[in-house]
């Protein structure tokens, strides 16, 4: 901060020395103007600038003093508020003490009155006993003792019954707590299953959409292949018509022989170009095109297979959950899944657990390795019958 000039500082950080630096800089500028234009140019401006600098000096000095004064004023206000709060608390405490003392005095007076009343009753009972002549016989005394013994036994039995009932109540309370915990756990499990069911239904919808897209792609490929087959059939018909036409136009002279030779050569070239479909060794496509088509076909079949298995698994899981919890998800409305049973599903239900997921992954790896070995084996220009049949059936 030492390299920053006074004019570049923040207003809150200015000091009196910074004001003097500003005044010095302004004075230097005035000297340059005076040297260049004379004193008359700034004669009226200089007193105003000096006054502004004096005001700035006073304000800066106040700003340095005012924070301390403001802090002291705030501290004084805080102490006053604390003192007032303390006085209020003391007054409140004093009132509470007075109320407690009044209550205590009232209770003490009531107790004294009760003691006096009991003393009077005691004196009256003593006087009554002294006046009466109570002569209890021995039989009455034994009878009284027997009654007391029976009462003690009854009280003991009642106490045992009460203790037993208390233990049963405590056991019932513990069972009730456990039942409540089980109910809470079941409710949490129900909410979790509802969430899983919602996610599975969403995934089933996505899988169905993917399956529809793949089916549409398959239909488009089949239509494309049918158009190609129709084009090949039309080319065969044109070749047959050209051949019949050339055979009907043969002549007996030498020019006719030359023309026939030329026609036969053109027919051979046309036949070579049109590709005889009866020849099993005809070059229908290049090797790279054959590989690309077979690879794409196998990928699509694998995707369709995996999507069908996943869809069947999700539908079966949804059916099981709805069978276990028929009223678990009243908010979500969706179509009831149709359970599908197939041998492939029983063999490759790999989406349920991690143990079932591994065989399918190994099968996909084996399929990719076998397809890679087939492409490595067919690197030359030989066309196998299996590849040709696959192209014809696509």
From Swiss-Prot:
GO terms for cellular component: centrosome; cilium; cytosol; membrane. It comes from the Eukaryota. The keyword Coiled coil applies. SUPFAM superfamilies: RILP dimerisation region (SSF161256). Its main location: cytoplasm. Residues 282-347 form the RH2 domain. Disulfide bonds: none annotated. Residues 318-337 are annotated as: Disordered. Keywords: Cell projection, Cilium, Coiled coil, Cytoplasm, Cytoskeleton, Protein transport, Transport. It holds the Pfam family RILP. Residues 2-89 form the RH1 domain. It is found in: Cytoplasm, Cytosol; Cytoplasm, Cytoskeleton, Microtubule organizing center, Centrosome; Cell projection, Cilium. One of its GO terms (biological process) is nitric oxide mediated signal transduction. Residues 68-312 form a coiled coil. Plays a role in the regulation of cell shape and polarity. Plays a role in cellular protein transport, including protein transport away from primary cilia. Neuroprotective protein. Belongs to the RILPL family. This is RILP-like protein 1. The lineage of its organism: Eukaryota, Metazoa, Chordata, Craniata, Vertebrata. The gene is rilpl1.
């Amino acid at each position: 901060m030492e390299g920053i000039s006074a004019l570049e500082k923040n207003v809150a950080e200015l000091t009196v020395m910074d004001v003097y630096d500003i005044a010095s800089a302004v004075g230097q500028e005035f000297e340059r103007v005076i040297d260049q234009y004379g004193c008359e140019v700034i004669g009226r401006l200089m007193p105003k600038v000096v006054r502004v600098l004096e005001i700035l000096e006073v304000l800066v000095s106040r700003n340095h003093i005012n924070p301390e004064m403001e802090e002291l004023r705030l501290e004084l206000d805080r102490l006053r508020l604390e003192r007032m709060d303390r006085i209020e608390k003391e007054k409140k405490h004093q009132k509470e003490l007075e109320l407690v003392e009044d209550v205590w005095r009232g209770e003490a007076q009531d107790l004294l009155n009760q003691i006096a009343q009991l003393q009077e009753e005691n004196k009256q009972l003593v006087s009554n006993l002294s006046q009466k002549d109570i002569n209890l016989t021995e039989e009455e005394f034994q009878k009284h003792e027997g009654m007391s013994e029976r009462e003690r036994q009854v009280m003991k039995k009642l106490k045992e019954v009460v203790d037993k009932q208390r233990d049963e109540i405590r056991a019932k309370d513990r069972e009730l707590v456990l039942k409540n915990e089980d109910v809470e756990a079941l409710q949490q499990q129900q909410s979790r299953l509802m969430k899983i069911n919602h996610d599975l239904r969403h995934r089933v919808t996505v899988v169905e959409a993917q399956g529809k897209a793949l089916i549409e792609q398959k239909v488009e490929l089949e239509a494309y292949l049918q158009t190609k087959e129709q084009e090949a059939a039309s080319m065969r018909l044109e070749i047959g018509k050209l051949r019949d036409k050339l055979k009907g136009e043969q002549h007996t002279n030498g020019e006719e022989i030359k023309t026939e030779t030329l026609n036969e050569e053109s027919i051979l070239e046309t036949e070579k170009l049109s590709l005889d479909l009866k020849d099993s060794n005809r070059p229908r496509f290049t090797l790279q095109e054959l590989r690309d088509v077979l690879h794409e076909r196998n990928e699509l079949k694998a995707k369709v297979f995996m999507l069908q298995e996943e869809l069947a698994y999700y539908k079966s899981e949804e059916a099981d959950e709805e069978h276990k919890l028929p009223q678990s998800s009243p908010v979500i409305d969706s179509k009831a899944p149709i359970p599908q049973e197939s041998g492939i599903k029983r063999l490759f239900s790999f989406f349920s657990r991690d143990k079932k997921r591994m065989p399918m992954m190994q099968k996909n790896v084996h399929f990719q390795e076998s397809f890679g070995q087939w492409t490595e084996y067919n690197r030359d220009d030989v066309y196998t019958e299996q590849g040709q049949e696959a192209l014809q059936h696509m």
